[in-house]
Amino acid sequence: MRRQTVLVILAPMAAVDRQQPRAAMASLDEAVAGVWAVAALGRLAESGTLARLGAGDGRLDDPVELADARLLAAYGLLEADAHGYRVPAGSALTADASAGVAREHLLQAIAHTRGQPPGWQSGDRAILHAQGRASTRLAGVIEDDLLPRMPEARDALSAGRGRLLDVGVGVAALSIALAERFPGIHIVGLDVLPAALEIARTQVAVAEMRERIELRLQSVAAITDEDAFDLAWVPQTFIARDELEAGLARVWTAVRPGGWIILALAGDSDGGRVDAYHALLATILGGGPMGVQEGTELLERHCHSSLICSEALHPQPLLLAQRRP
């Protein structure tokens, strides 16, 4: 007896009550794709391939690297051309910064899934190193975007006689990067996390900058320096709100007339995905979300001056700057 082949077509389930789960799964797929894009960025950066693409050599022979590049191109982080892939013109996607950002966020995300408590208290050396590596890009932001608007601080740092206060110095990566850009300046770095300062001391010694970078186990609210600094860097994201409230007045006193405070804000969420992510990260790190209006009010409240010079100077991190007259 001849058998008949029966073709069964499985039609999409069109029931209304199935649409919501489908939409949720699609959103989850997009979120997971973003995680893997960060991982792909880190892999290409760590291997040296990203630097090679940035230098104009777009050939990729390894199938995994090719898949990494395709994913990054889908997110606009790379561009495809006839010769392979390239870093978009004008991109801040340097290999070292990309590696640091990727490693930092992936490690923090894993720690978050394991229930790590919020606040600047993690002693995880890998996370601390990654955060430091990611922070070095801010040295370029300070030199290229901020200091041109701060003539007194710019002149002091450029002349090699400036003094800088780095609140939340961490592993001293930003301090070292700034000391390299401005030979001769002196930096005081504060932190309340002994594990971070232990790494920082090693990093400063390796960089041969122990005479130029002073590290203190000290809260920003406990500093007693007066008229001592041309520039102060205060990352709100890492500082608990009560400590920040108490510390800003002390920083204002520590900055000399004509000096500047840079307040780096986490931003606040308007319901968008990226803003919601920044708010989550800021909550995890201990400072919580803070936008321009709240940051400006904070400066006005604690930096006692009739001349307020606060303005949003940079999109992310969101930076406010105020000059002491």
Residue positions per predicted region:
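A short SAM/SAH-binding and catalytic strip from SAM-dependent methyltransferases
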Residues: 230-244
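Short alpha-helix
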Residues: 287-303
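Conserved Class I S-adenosyl-L-methionine-dependent methyltransferase catalytic core
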Residues: 74-161
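Conserved SAM/SAH-binding beta-strand->alpha-helix loop
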Residues: 193
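A short glycine-rich, Lys/Arg-flanked "PGG" loop and its adjoining helix->strand segment in the class I
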Residues: 245-257
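A short acidic, Gly/Pro-enriched loop at the edge of an enzyme's catalytic core
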Residues: 221-232
